[in-house]
Amino acid sequence: MSELYTFDESYKRLLGLDIDGVDIAGIKVQGLKNASPMKDILDLSGKVAIVTGGSRGLGLCIVSRFCEAGASVVIADIAVEFAEAAVDYFSTKGKKVKFIKTDVRFLSQIQNAVDFTVQEFGKVDILVNNAAIWKMNKFFDLTEETWDNTIDVGLKGTVFFTQAVAKQMVEQGQGGKIVNVASVAGLSMESSYGLLIQYVAAKSGVVGVSQSLARELKPLGININCVLPGGMVSPGAIHSAPTPELRKITNAHPTVPVTDPDDVARVVFMLATEISNYMHGATVVADGGARLMIQK
């Protein structure tokens, strides 16, 4: 390993940071800690992750990136056929991936997923709350069922999966990483064409919850941060395409970038590694510049 990455005394002096014991504005500065090479920072060997909604689209890309970095992964999803196919695929690659059918609307199933993960792999180090549903509709066409399902999956599931995993992390005493997948729709109604009020409500809630929980979880050694993707090519997007009537509304807006979900998965991956050690309650936008194009 190169001496450059050890922050030895010579390197500290080079940086002008050989300052152990110095008092700055009443804060005792202990100087730089030893640093790890990037290859070690990005290495998830020995880590165990749960990814909700991990059977397809963005979730599957996240699972793939975690596996590539050496993590063991549990897919918590309701799509049995797709999840089992994913497990079979990763097994042929020698990766450790398990699946448990989980409807994140129900706390009992959330706890079952956490217990299953601990039983299979001994612990939980990383949680990615990715499960969500969305459907385009005008406000006057919104039904109670659509509202409840969207909020329960996207917001309630995120809150209570975070609670269950955070309790497990505290019990383990090793801290951990929690990454919540929100959306740029949670920041701007414009980005959702005004046709996703229930989805906007859920994702706005995820952003707020992530920021609020960061204060409580930071002293426990748990980093919780939030990724806000823009439009992605995914099965969910294809199956939720607007009707011809709604298409007239979406076509009236500027064309915005639609990305490969792996572009977003890389950002999620970053927040699940030691790169995010100094990040608490951050909201990281990964929308290909879409917000810049639709702002007036």
What are these regions (language model features)?
Residues K167, E171, R215-E216, N277:
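Alpha-helical segment proximal to the catalytic Tyr-Lys
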Residues K138-F139, T143-I151, I238, I249:
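Substrate-binding pocket helix/loop in short-chain dehydrogenase/reductase
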